[in-house]
Amino acid sequence: MGLETEKADVQLFMDDDSYSRHSGVDYADPKKFVDPGTDRDPHRLNSNLKVGFEDVIAEPVSTHSFDKVWICSHALFEISKYVIYKFLTVFLAIPLAFAAGILFATLSCLHIWIIIPFVKTCLMVLPSVQTIWKSVTDVVIAPLCTSAGRSFSSVSLQLSHD
């Protein structure tokens, strides 16, 4: 809570001429709003993910393949990585984003409406519980331990080496 100091990542662009008051939907041109230079991993969550050809495939100096093989394998690696990644994102990105959204919304709801109130309630009740526990300890457990200690203090063991 409090004053927001960070800029929002989401912006809404609306031109007066493209805004229509009729009931039909007027879709904007997506190319107009997509910035190809945008950093999609600003917090470097996937900085350890190495997908460059040189990071995955390397030949030592003593065992080089033919130059044409190296060039073709590099090209095939990059093309297959690009095509398969695009293919997988087309079919998996939206359902996984939807599932992750549901999961995070559920966890947020549970955290906000169940876990935090439960913890706050426990923290409110703990001083009373602490007082009751101290009284139970002083009335019941302390006398039992004291009497057991006195009983066992009179026991003596003598060992003989015969």
Swiss-Prot record:
Residue spans, topological domain Cytoplasmic: 1-86, 108-162
Coiled-coil spans in chain: none
Keyword vocabulary terms for this entry: Cell membrane, Cytoplasm, Golgi apparatus, Membrane, Nucleus, Phosphoprotein
Keyword 4Fe-4S set for record: no
Residues modified as Phosphotyrosine: 19, 27
One MF annotation (Gene Ontology) recorded for this entry: scaffold protein binding
PTM annotation, UniProt: Phosphorylated on serine and tyrosine residues. CAV1 promotes phosphorylation on Ser-23 which then targets the complex to the plasma membrane, lipid rafts and caveolae. Phosphorylation on both Tyr-19 and Tyr-27 is required for insulin-induced 'Ser-727' phosphorylation of STAT3 and its activation. Phosphorylation on Tyr-19 is required for insulin-induced phosphorylation of MAPK1 and DNA binding of STAT3. Tyrosine phosphorylation is induced by both EGF and insulin.
InterPro entries in the record: Caveolin, Caveolin_CS
GO BP terms in the entry: basement membrane organization; caveola assembly; cell differentiation; endoplasmic reticulum organization; endothelial cell proliferation; insulin receptor signaling pathway; mitochondrion organization; negative regulation of endothelial cell proliferation
UniProt feature: intramembrane region: 87-107
Bilayer topology: Peripheral membrane protein
Record's subunit section: Monomer or homodimer. Interacts with CAV1; the interaction forms a stable heterooligomeric complex that is required for targeting to lipid rafts and for caveolae formation. Tyrosine phosphorylated forms do not form heterooligomers with the Tyr-19-phosphorylated form existing as a monomer or dimer, and the Tyr-27-form as a monomer only. Interacts (tyrosine phosphorylated form) with the SH2 domain-containing proteins, RASA1, NCK1 and SRC. Interacts (tyrosine phosphorylated form) with INSR, the interaction (Tyr-27-phosphorylated form) is increased on insulin stimulation.
Family, similarity comment: Belongs to the caveolin family.
Protein name per Swiss-Prot or TrEMBL: Caveolin-2
Primary gene name: CAV2
